[in-house]
Amino acid sequence: MSERTASQPNTDRSRRRLRVVLDVALSDAAACPLEEIDGEVTAVRHQYTGDDCHADVTVAPACPDDDRSDVMHVATQTTDSCLCCVFSDHGCVPQITAVAADTITVETYLADRTTLTDLVADLKAVANTVSLTHLTRLAADDQSGDSHTHVTLDLFKLTDKQREAAAAAVAKGYYATPRGADLSDLATALGISKSAVSQRLSAVESKLATSAFTEAQQSAGSAP
């Protein structure tokens, strides 16, 4: 019996500091087979290998009285305009969390804000629109000694400039305790003045506070 030679696989490990959720409205060029699934998609498990994409798609039962979900397997060959390819090009693992009409919601983890900027730019090249809806900072700067700081922002109701400022603030630790960056750092990163950064973040915080207050009122009003 021949002996199998053990080989050491090449492993690339890097810490992911940001969690993002993106709503991607697909263009015809970036059409995804998930759009063709009939019914409400409740879960997607997919594997992207080489030029092939395989997905197990769980679909909610059409009848409310039926508690059995259908699982559809979808296999397709990818192209350069495939969303999975774009994420892979940036070293990201996409997790599809929702499919509605022509919009796919994707969650992924990133190393830094530069990767986020590049990823969104490349997604916009193959999609109709790309919206960053949630951004979570998973770890504070190494110097702080705190690796459990989580800061999350819901960015859905912000303008593009406000979203950019909020993303930079979270990514650089502006909202961490202690702060990992100040207004000067953010101004340098964004290429704008400190006063402009301050104004944008004030608008962000105001919108987020208003949204949170409204949601709290609605929850209180619907409580029995």
Swiss-Prot record:
Involved in activating dmsEABCD gene expression related to dimethyl sulfoxide (DMSO) reductase. Required for anaerobic respiration on dimethyl sulfoxide (DMSO) and trimethylamine N-oxide (TMAO). Keywords: Activator, Transcription, Transcription regulation. The gene is dmsR. Residues 158-209 form the HTH bat-type domain. Disruption phenotype: Cells lacking this gene displayed a marked decrease in growth under anaerobic conditions using either DMSO or TMAO as terminal electron acceptors. InterPro entries: DmsR-like_N, HTH_bacterioopsin. This is Dimethyl sulfoxide reductase transcriptional activator. PANTHER family: DIMETHYL SULFOXIDE REDUCTASE TRANSCRIPTIONAL ACTIVATOR (PTHR34236:SF1).
